[in-house]
Amino acid sequence: MEEPGMPHESAEDLFHFNVGGWHFSVPRSKLAQFPDSLLWKEASALTSSENQRLFIDRDGSTFRHVHYYLYTSKLSFSSCAELNLLYEQALGLQLMPLLQTLDNLKEGKHHLRVRPADIPVAERASLNYWRTWKCISKPSEFPIKSPAFTGLHDKAPLGLMDTPLLDTEEEVHYCFLPLDLVAKHPSLVTEDNLLWLAETMALIECECSEFRFIVNFLRSQKILLPDNFSNIDVLEAEVEILEIPELSEAVRLYRMNMGGCSRTSCPPPSPGKGGRSAGLESVKPLYMMALGLLVKYPDSALGQLRIESTLDGSRLYITGNGVLFQHVKNWLGTCRLPLTETVSEVYELCAFLDKRDITYEPMKVALKTHLEPRTLAPMDVLNEEWTAEITVYSSQQIIKVYVGSHWYATTLQTLLKYPELLSNPQRVYWITYGQTLLIYGDGQMFRHILNFLRLGKLFLPTEFKEWPLLCQEVEEYHIPSLSEALVQCEAYKSWIQEKESENEEAFPIRRLHVVTEGPGSLVEFSRDTKETMACVPMEFQDCNDRTMWNKAKGTLARSSQIEEAEQYSQTIQMSLCRGAKRAGNPSTYSHCPGLCANPRHWGGHPESPPKKKCTTVNLTQKPETKDPPVTPMQKLISLVREWDMVNCKQWEFQSLPAPRNSSLEEATLQHSSGSEAVSQPSTSASWKGHSTASEKDPGPQAGAGAGTKDKGPEPNFNPYFPMKRAVALKDWGKQRSKERENPAFELTLPEASEGDNTGVILKVTHPPVVGSDGSCMFFEDSIIYTTHMDHLRRTPPPASPQPREVTFLSFSLSWEEMFYAQKCHCFLTDIILDSIRQNDPKAITAKVVSLVNQLWTLHISPKQFVVDLLAITGFKDDRHTQERLYSWVELTLPFARKYGRCVDLLIQRGLSKSVSYSVLSKYLQDG
């Protein structure tokens, strides 16, 4: 009930703040008492139509004390443990009265208000929250009934409170586990404790908060407990249930060293007692865990189920449109549950469902629907069913970070300050790229590490007792600055001296091994957390000089809203809730090593799109040796596996700088050197004989380096700069202020008569582009064939500069669709460029250009295109090649057309860094 004397505040009178994942609401009347604070300045600047929650990238637990002070103008008793961190927040928020109160407290002029219910109230509020607001995507609007209310932090982050998984009034302990760990220790996951499953992790319910020490041991093989740990009995009971021998032995030895029992009196580890691992010698298949999870929910929560798959059909996923899936997607960015990893498991899944009862009927129907034969939709109707969309992400992208039994919210900019964190494949997994991050570590310790990432300084509670565990965590993150900060920490030095003076063998001193250097490459990432009430990030500058936050207000960038969302409305710097990505290899896709995809899924499956690693921005990559294709899709890929290499190896674009006050020179394609060409077989080698103009060459097939002395004219690519250049991802942290000016030059695109409707090949460099499915790979260059130049030519340059912190983009295509779209574009442009390079007669080149044009404009079918193409002199024409090539073109052409529209939109929107074009008609002219 509402406490007497507390004025009721309507929703319109409340300001909402998301502080590091904790949600707070403050009445306007209370906040107005601090007119000089940044909280008031930022919140009061919002218009009534802006139903937004301001995001502050700071520690939410500490902000509870700020929140309490805003209500009462007093400090709570529990704040005394973290006065340094509280002072930092007050300084950054410019809460001068709170700073004065803290100074008075230091001088003994202020006494803390005893408030026993401080933290318990917060926990009760959050429990009530996730029972009341279960399975909805809207952020909570918890009514403020008492000044004791200290913010909402969802103790069970998924809020899966529907019967029967979490049908309890008690606090629910949870833990995020990497699937690799589950594979090693299957007893960790059971039908009763599994809450959710994704490609990289499993979320389980725990019996107690001490479960985190078990997970820490399984990672480090060390029992690291707080000083004077008193809950060893609870921990031991949980260990007994798991029946992991090495864990049981480690806990037994720890108890002996504590003095709880001697070697003679301490009982040996008992054999199996029918615990979780009984009968579980290996991990269950994913489909058994996923379907076993879903059958516990009512059909009303699941909605309409459907099965999705990769294009080769090897990996299946199940999802639905019910409130359960909507809620999970709001938290994790994805709601697909993985079912299979290989083609053979698809058959096992069918056999498994055949033996299930009526409770599995919705899953059976979904699988049957998925396996029904389907015909490809006509290409000319794709326009009505699909719309090209681009989502823009900035460095202020809000990322939810799940660590063990805790979760946090921060910005991509914070995670980028120390790139060693995200380049650590042993600790970091993306659940949804750039939106939700899984870190394999201790959740409580990560709070201190995250505060270091934010502030550049280590803030620890006064009575900190987990030094051995903190040392272990700091070592494993491989962040030199963090290691140095701990070494310089006075409290850490005191603890070391204390343990050395005690000289106790029972407590081996856990000294810190300082990391002197981290991984050499900077890897970056991706995408944004989407709330129905958009979070507008508020960025602290330097806390020591009390400068204001900066801000750019806007809605989430999608479809028609994107134009408004990208505009800067004020000089206060505060950018969109969007994120970042990393550089890669032109004309191919890039992959951030270790942290992007689940290694269980991408590493060893030939049916998956191959993965290429990037350690530097412009790394030249060699083709990978692949296993023989095992699926029909891979058989198609094998036919054209090297066709894309012409544009990224044999034909390399010159860089296209845009210096001011200098003329733009025509950029030409350069043929690779002989030694490099040998390693890249000509794309014509697999499907084309020697060129007509090169018949004097002895070999029946022209290699990549063959015919160079008779090589025809090199295609010219003219630079075209339709916009001010976007800041590259690798540069935004170094030169934010440097690139405010510097507009790039523009060149008009060719007139229609010059293009003569034969088409144009575009090379577009742009910020990293990811798929809409949250995959962790991306493109930075796109080479496309297009005939739609009129709308690009009519597009005026942007009237105002684009956001300086556009770090990556997302197309309305999945990663796999973009992958095959690029392959198709490279194939179409390659057969044209190859004909020019081989100095074919102009009649043959004109025929090739005409066929590509007719295929692209849908004047001929893919089958007719293949028949006519292979009938050209010099091409291999046999039935087997014809059928395979026809199937491949039919599959990939729709993706290529969609991708081309997205690139067109990217250019129109001024999001490209540079555009080069080559008009094909001039190579068909006589003389």
Swiss-Prot record:
Sequence positions bearing Phosphoserine: S270
Record keywords, A-Z: Activator, Differentiation, Meiosis, Nucleus, Phosphoprotein, Repeat, Spermatogenesis, Transcription, Transcription regulation
Gene3D superfamilies xref list: Potassium Channel Kv1.1, Chain A (3.30.710.10)
A Pfam family recorded for this sequence: BTB_2
Compartment annotation: Nucleus
Keyword Transcription regulation in annotation: yes
Main location: nucleus
Stretches with biased composition (Polar residues): 662-692
Function per UniProt: Transcription regulator which is essential for male fertility and for the completion of meiotic prophase in spermatocytes. Regulates progression of the pachytene stage of meiotic prophase and promotes the transcriptional activation activity ZNF541. Required for the organization of chromosomes during metaphase I.
Protein name: BTB/POZ domain-containing protein KCTD19
Originating organism: Bos taurus
Organism taxonomic ancestry: Eukaryota, Metazoa, Chordata, Craniata, Vertebrata
The gene coding this protein: KCTD19
